[in-house]
């Protein structure tokens, strides 16, 4: 990921504004990053959002400007200008433009400031007839029934990405599982149980059958198997720090990675929860250490092994993801364990709590 983007952006969009002035959403079909030409900013105007008249719009955009009395919403044309994407958003229009930039793949996650996003947005009823306020929705539903059956997709701050942006070269099995503001590189597959939040996503072709929460990115060839999760915990202001899972890294079924980054070519075995203070057993040099010891490093396998209380971490070379099963990784680990078996008649003791206690006592006596 690159540094914060200081480029500006300007775009024309259609906003749904409730009768009380609440901005429900804004759709920007063709956002463009600015150049450094000074005259461009003079033509665009001051940062912020302004309403546009008929002379500022194409016939197609003008046809979308209307008063929807059934929804009690006005659809208005606006132009939103952001002078510097490294500065925090100032209102809901600003937030929606930034979300569009991410889903259009014009900027990557964490290359623009998303501070206080939820504080700028309101809770919305997302329907097949358009966004509505939740407070008067049952009254609105009665009016909308004359236009056919009403489908409510959700009641939340953020909508589905595909209702605003459909990036090329991706597969999304369930539209509800990808939010506007997700960054999906071409070649990405989000399977039925996958989920990608805003300001998160894939930086290369990847397979997502787990959850990528806000603030999380994964590299090319990464595989999140069923029910796996990568979580960047929210700060006091609601923002989530950057967390990255490297290229060709596999997260096993029902595994969770919280506040710890992994590098390239790693394997996190099934049914594991790894947090910063999770104790790992490093088998190569027979020691215990927290998971932060290897945060962001390449080529680690972390799995459950019989006879060990802690997850076992081993340094592996040339680890590659061969699909969602990860069977080749399991086979290579078995081969390495076989080579490491003692050649004497004395069997190696399993690492139980009592074993570690005896070893600690011996070291103390010396």
Show which residues each predicted segment covers.
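Glycine-rich adenosyl-nucleotide cofactor-binding module
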Residues: 141-192, 196-197, 202-203
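Terminal amphipathic alpha-helical/low-complexity segments used for targeting or macromolecular assembly
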Residues: 1-163, 293-366
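Glycine-rich hexapeptide-repeat left-handed beta-helix
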Residues: 211-220, 224-346, 351-354, 358-366
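Generic structural hydrophobic/aromatic packing signal, biased to beta-strands
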Residues: 26, 99, 172, 176-178, ...
């Amino acid at each position: 990921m690159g540094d914060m983007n200081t480029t500006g952006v300007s775009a024309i969009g259609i906003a749904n504004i409730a009768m009380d002035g609440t901005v429900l959403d804004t759709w920007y079909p063709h956002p463009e990053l600015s150049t450094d030409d000074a005259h461009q900013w003079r033509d665009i105007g001051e940062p912020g959002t302004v309403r546009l008249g008929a002379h500022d719009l194409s016939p197609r955009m003008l046809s979308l400007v209307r008063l929807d009395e059934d929804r009690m919403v006005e659809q208005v044309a606006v132009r939103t200008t952001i002078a510097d994407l490294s500065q925090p958003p100032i209102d809901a229009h600003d937030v929606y433009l930034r979300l569009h930039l991410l889903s259009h793949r014009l900027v990557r996650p964490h290359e623009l400031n998303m501070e206080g996003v939820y504080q700028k947005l309101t809770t919305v009823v997302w329907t097949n007839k358009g966004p509505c306020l939740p407070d008067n929705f049952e009254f609105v539903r009665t009016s909308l029934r004359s236009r056919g059956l009403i489908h409510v997709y959700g009641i939340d701050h953020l909508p589905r990405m595909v209702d605003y942006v459909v990036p090329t070269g991706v597969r999304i099995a369930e539209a509800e599982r990808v939010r506007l503001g997700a960054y999906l590189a071409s070649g990405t597959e989000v399977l039925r149980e996958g989920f990608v939040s805003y300001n998160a996503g894939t930086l290369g072709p990847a397979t997502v059958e787990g959850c990528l929460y806000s603030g999380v990115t994964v590299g090319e060839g990464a595989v999140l198997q069923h029910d796996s999760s990568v979580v960047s915990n929210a700060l006091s202001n609601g923002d989530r720090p950057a967390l990255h899972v490297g290229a060709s890294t596999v997260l096993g079924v029902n595994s969770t990675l919280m506040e710890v980054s992994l590098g390239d070519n790693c394997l996190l075995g099934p049914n594991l929860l790894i947090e910063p203070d999770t104790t790992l057993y490093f088998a190569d040099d027979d020691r215990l250490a927290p998971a932060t010891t290897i945060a962001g490093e390449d080529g680690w396998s972390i799995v459950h092994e019989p006879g060990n209380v802690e997850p076992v971490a081993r340094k592996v070379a040339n680890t590659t993801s061969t699909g969602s099963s990860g069977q080749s990784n399991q086979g290579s680990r078995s081969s390495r364990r076989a080579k490491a078996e003692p050649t004497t008649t004395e069997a190696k003791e399993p690492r139980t709590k009592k074993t570690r206690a005896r070893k600690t006592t011996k070291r103390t006596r010396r």
